[in-house]
Amino acid sequence: MRQHVNPLSRNFNEIERIPALIEMFGDSKSNLHLDIGCAAGEFLFDLALINTNWNYIGIEIRERLVKTAKLKVRERDIKNLYFIFGNANNILHDVQSKFIFKNVKSISFNFPDPWFKKRHYKRRVIQPEFLNLLSNSLQKGSLIFIKTDVKDLFDYMDCIISNNFNFKKIDKNDFNFSESFNPSQVKTNREKYVIVNQLDIFERIYIKI
């Protein structure tokens, strides 16, 4: 069972130091993908080992998971993967993080915390203010991927992104995954669980225009 953490807690107001890209990666000029709410990062470990031409950053709000993931990166000496602890909204709004967007080509939101109760919707990761930040920071052609097994959450995220005129939807059937951050279409642990249990998956791709 995934433990939900309130992203609006004051505990996340203080941002950890974000090192320069050259400190994070072996090749700091490679295309960069952000995975927001990466949990233990197994999805990113698989991607980083398969697709070494890309760099990956995972942002996760549960500190214990980030500490474990960082230790694994060091133990395995992986040069194209980095993890950051904290609230993604706060981190990416922080002035010290602005340089990250220079190389970002895509961002994924895979099975984020649904926060089912209406009074908790403000805790959901995708909010209009966050989309405005991405709209103002991402380069044209950058991609956003959303995926969830909760229809209400999908509709909520889709509505917010679609209402931002700087993003438009892409037909997944026309999308060339071979040139993306996930050429082998690696699946997260949650997606594997959903498939095994024959549950619905709702997903969409958007491009910055």
Swiss-Prot record:
Pfam families (alphabetical): Methyltransf_4
HAMAP family in alphabetical order: tRNA_methyltr_TrmB (MF_01057)
Gene designation per UniProt: trmB
Known function: Catalyzes the formation of N(7)-methylguanine at position 46 (m7G46) in tRNA.
Keyword Methyltransferase: yes
Xref: SUPFAM superfamilies: S-adenosyl-L-methionine-dependent methyltransferases
Matches recorded under PROSITE patterns: SAM_MT_TRMB (PS51625)
Reaction it catalyzes: guanosine(46) in tRNA + S-adenosyl-L-methionine = N(7)-methylguanosine(46) in tRNA + S-adenosyl-L-homocysteine
EC number, as in UniProt: 2.1.1.33
Protein name: tRNA (guanine-N(7)-)-methyltransferase
Keywords noted in UniProt: Methyltransferase, S-adenosyl-L-methionine, Transferase, tRNA processing
Binding site for S-adenosyl-L-methionine: D35, E60, N87, D113
Gene3D superfamilies attached to this UniProt entry: Vaccinia Virus protein VP39 (3.40.50.150)
Family (UniProt): Belongs to the class I-like SAM-binding methyltransferase superfamily. TrmB family.
Listed pathway(s): tRNA modification; N(7)-methylguanine-tRNA biosynthesis
Gene Ontology molecular-function annotations: tRNA (guanine(46)-N7)-methyltransferase activity
Active site: D113
